[in-house]
A protein has these predicted regions:
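HDAC/HDAC-like amidohydrolase catalytic core signature
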Residues: 1-244
Length: 244
């Protein structure tokens, strides 16, 4: 089910939603983000799927992704902040604390910008550094935000150690009722747009670890640009979520 404008405007400005609603021809909204007449429909469906996932404990396989979207403009292939909106929806529906765990290869700068200093939402991001969007580097953690920058070439072992040493204790200390995963698969060893070495088994492990952090877990697809491997990686993550 498509999200409503009111749900989207929990995060984004009405003026920005108007811009997306008014697109009449295909165009470059930014240097890396395309829009057109069907962008609003696709984006509202993506947000709606993310909201349904957080309500039911599902995995929303959506496009466009969302974790780079800013409150008043698109960025990095992202139109609306699917996960940030779903987290705000959960809080508005009576959940007291939501933790977002983002393992996309890129820092979730849009999500962080939305939720930073929101005491009801914790945000943890594991990402390649230095790398686009060149945010979330060393020294940027604080309050309700944990950034875990990892060097190019990091694989299953490095991700597992970082998750166990940094992400897990921080999220457990927050005591979330819901964990919402920004599940990007562009840290895979065969992804063409990055330089990490995570395998299908590594994503299965990350999903299983994430599922142990709260009574309810949901996930939303972010990046993943090798279309030949992406379906198998999503299946591996689903196996991890379901193993707990």
């Amino acid at each position: 089910m498509a999200a409503s404008r009111a749900q989207v405007e929990r995060v984004h400005t009405a003026a920005y939603v108007d811009v997306i609603a008014g697109l009449e021809v295909e165009c470059m909204l930014t240097i890396d983000t395309v829009g057109g007449p069907t962008t609003l429909e696709a984006s509202l469906l993506a947000v709606g799927c993310a909201i349904e996932a957080v309500e039911t404990g599902g995995f929303a396989v959506v496009r466009p992704p969302g974790h780079h979207a800013l409150v008043d403009r698109p960025m990095g292939f992202c139109i609306f902040g699917n996960v940030a909106i779903a987290a705000r929806h959960a809080i508005g529906s009576g959940v007291e604390r939501v933790a977002i765990v983002d393992w996309d290869v890129h820092h979730g700068n849009g999500t962080e910008a939305v939720v930073r200093d929101d005491p009801a939402i914790f945000f943890a991001s594991m990402h390649q550094w230095p790398f686009y969007p060149f945010t979330g580097g060393p020294g940027t953690s604080g309050g309700n935000v944990l950034n875990v920058p990892l060097p190019e070439g990091s694989g299953d072992d490095e991700y597992a150690r970082a998750f166990e040493a940094e992400v897990e204790p921080a999220v457990r200390a927050f005591e979330p009722e819901v964990v919402l995963v920004s599940a990007g698969f562009d840290a895979h060893e065969a992804d063409p747009l990055a330089g990490m070495r995570v395998t299908a088994a590594g994503f299965r492990d990350l999903a299983a670890r994430s599922a142990q952090l709260a009574p309810r877990v949901a996930a939303v697809l972010e990046g993943g640009y090798n279309v030949a491997t992406l379906p198998a990686l999503v299946r591996s993550a689903l196996q991890g979520f379901e193993s707990v």
